[in-house]
C-alpha cells in the first residue's frame, strides 16, 4: 500500500510517517518500480504500535529502543 493509504488506515499523517522513517523509528519500506513507498502489514503494525506508545506518553527515544 502507498503512504496515503497507510496514513488513512492508521490515522497518522503522511508527513509524520516520513519523519519516523528519517529518524529511524519506522524502517523505510521497499520501493516500487515507480519509486513509491510500498508499505505492508509489518509497517502498519509498527506504525500502530508507535502511535499507541506516543498516546501512552512514551518518548520518541524510548520508542526507538523498543
Language model features with spans:
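Glycine-centered, phosphate/nucleic-acid-interacting loop/turn motifs that mediate DNA/RNA or nucleotide
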Residues: 24
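Arg/Lys-rich, alpha-helical DNA-contact motif
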Residues: 2-9, 27-33, 38-66
Amino acid at each position: 500500500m502507498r503512504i496515503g493509504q497507510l496514513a488513512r488506515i492508521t490515522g497518522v499523517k503522511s508527513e509524520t510517517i516520513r519523519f519516523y522513517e528519517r529518524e529511524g523509528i519506522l524502517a523505510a519500506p521497499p520501493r516500487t518500480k515507480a519509486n513509491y513507498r510500498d508499505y505492508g502489514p509489518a509497517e502498519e503494525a509498527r506504525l500502530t504500535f508507535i502511535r499507541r506508545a506516543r498516546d501512552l506518553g512514551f518518548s520518541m527515544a524510548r520508542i526507538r529502543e523498543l
